[in-house]
Amino acid sequence: MKRILKWIVRIVLILLVLAFLFVFVAYWRSTNDCGKTAAPTNPMKAVVRCDYGLANLKLEDIEKPAPDADQVLVKVRAVSVNPYDWHFIEGSPKFMRAMIGGLRKPKDIRLGVDFAGTVEGVGKNVTQYKAGDEVFGGSTGAFAQYLCRRATGAVAPKPAGLTFEQAASINIAGITALQGVRDKGKVQPGQKVLINGASGGVGTFAVQIAKSYGADVTGVCSTRNIELVQSLGADHVIDYTKEDFTKGDEKYDVILDNVGNHSLSECRRVLTPNGNYVLIGGGSANEQGFLGALGKALNAAVYSHFVKQKMGMMMAQPSTQDLTLLAEMVASGKLKVVIDRTYKSLSEVPDAIRYLEQGHARGKVVITVE
């Protein structure tokens, strides 16, 4: 069986490499607009990059966007950073560069996704928002003073009880946790759920959401984060510096893995016979190699066809409904936003990303936009 699995994985990898070579030829001439645009007539500050790598981030004046007929113009008040941002900035794993259309240089120079702010203007077809409304959500190019977002896209009204920093923390981490627990993990009352990386951005949301679904939750974190994870409602906490959860006797119905630091076979050992293993967002930013965590995701997909256990990777899908649900849960006190650090300027985006990259953030890392 193992030999068959290995050959299947090899064939899949070969096909992926061939696909990549095709994309490589198509995108070899990929470039961007750095140095080619005229000086902005209506400038705003934004974090941009002309090449891959954290060292290439710059805070520059670019043209302030104007909303089209179906968009809202948002004055950004706060943004948050995610592992996704690190992958996007670094173009890592290398396979990702083909997916975003920039093998040599990034095609898109704008950065950031999670935001919260105030509507400054709306397009002629927009009726659900008006100038002055406070909103939050996700949009490419969020690391800026202004952004335009389709009014029916991933944007929702910000509840009055939330700060801009809290609201900016919700989008990717909150939706990933909600969809991981509800949709991919299919958590049911009474099930035993283990969350690896319980003190991070997604993990802090996932612990609380899994508890709201009636699960018996075990969180895995470091010694310094035990009290935090307990305060979020975890029934049990495993200190990974002292204990390896894959070597314990406990079996879990669902494992939500935000870290990806154990092999699939190790995780399968502590899954129930019909258990569900969910690799969240590709694992940590430390995954290296051409495919990064995608290799593990492919292995998981293959495993699932030969065993009763379900194994796979999930990426959050933008959802206005889920944004609204999460905001209501936070506003009502049913869900707590954990913020580790708040930086005070867009110029500190590189520092925020470096801190997140270390892998020890407690909850979310936020930046206030001046």
Q: Locations of the language-model features?
A:
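A structural motif shared across PLP-dependent enzymes of the aminotransferase-like
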Residues: 139-152
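Glycine-rich beta-strand-centered segment in the early N-terminal region that forms part
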Residues: 65-80, 94-141
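N-terminal Sec-pathway targeting helices
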Residues: 1-18
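C-terminal capping/lid region of NAD(P)-dependent oxidoreductase domains
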Residues: 6, 328, 334-342, 350-370
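Mid-domain Rossmann-like dinucleotide-binding core that forms the NAD(H)/NADP(H) cofactor-binding site
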Residues: 168-239
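A short acidic, Gly/Pro-enriched loop at the edge of an enzyme's catalytic core
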Residues: 246-254
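Glycine-rich phosphate-binding loop and adjacent beta-alpha segment
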Residues: 262-335, 369-370
